[in-house]
Amino acid sequence: MYKRQVEYGGELRCVQVDADGIHEVEIHNDVFKAPEIQEEQTVTTSSVADVIISLRGNRYIQEKTFGNISSFNFTSKAFNDRVWDEQTTKARGLYIDTFKGRVAARAYDKFFNINERPETKFDMLQNKLQFPVTAYVKENGFLGLVSYDEYNDDLLIASKSTIEGPFAGWLKDMIYEKVTPENIENMKRFAKDNNVTFVFECVDMKHDPHIIEYPESNLYLLDIVYNQINYAKYDYDAMCDTAHRFGLTPKKKACELATWQEFYDWYYDILEDDYEYNGRVIEGFVIEDSTGYMTKIKLAYYNFWKFMRTISHEAIRNGYIKKTSALTTPLANEYYAWVRKLHDTEDPANVPRDICTLRRWFYNDMKQAEGDSLI
């Protein structure tokens, strides 16, 4: 006897043996109970109230409260232990009005570097990416969010995790410096009417220089994202049109790649040590395929000087580093020999720690040394 979900209206199948031989018999069940379908409970299909409960119950997610609004972000332990699931990837620059049960502002779901995760291994991308794919220049600053604050009829300006603190303050200062009062008012009205967040890369060379040096501080509008749990955003052309209306600088589309072969060739070209985009060094690229799937690439110049920043901090503090075997290139060894001497200055505590300044000093000293050698 074989049951084919007979309890849910299927058939009971059996074998009957009689004088005429062996026969298969199926008896259909017309009296049955409907199956109880277990729906997958995820943050993308739940109500906002359910999401709040779910996020608060996750030990890898940190909540910060600002009156009725809370920010939810993955913890450093989640990052270090690579605890990535639908909740921890969602909790990145996510602001929820927990009193009204609505999203107040939001950034991207977390996405990963090529080769950082099993699903982003380069060889896996051939089957993962849906072509054409678009590459956008990845500027090197900190993430900033601008939405509508209905409680104060003002802009809600936030960093990735807080509406207080220095980063939110620097972002606010930058907005009021770069955007006219009229356009600030227009942005506020636009964010309110369309229930969206302006997502920025804030390059602040005065307060927070990163790895790539810029001639001046600037704001780059990355995307306009809907204030909802399910991630959705304006398309690139609509985002650019809106940016230009408000006097903002949109992110730069670098290229569109129609096939895997085009992507493959481009990928290995940009990984060259001396690669520059339109004559300048950049952090990397964000890749977005035709379905919205995103991954990113960090380039050689950025990776090298990010590593040398760590070397610098240890060398200035101690006068040496423990693992000199990590210095695998002539440039790395030359820079290390230079930067460790800063430990012996009269006041090493006041030596700049940002790599942009240190790198500039290093090259200036190298140029001067070359000039002296010619005399």
Show the residue positions of the predicted features.
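Feature recognizes metal-dependent phosphohydrolase scaffolds
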Residues: 1-42
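Core nucleotide-handling region used for phosphoryl-transfer chemistry
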Residues: 39-375
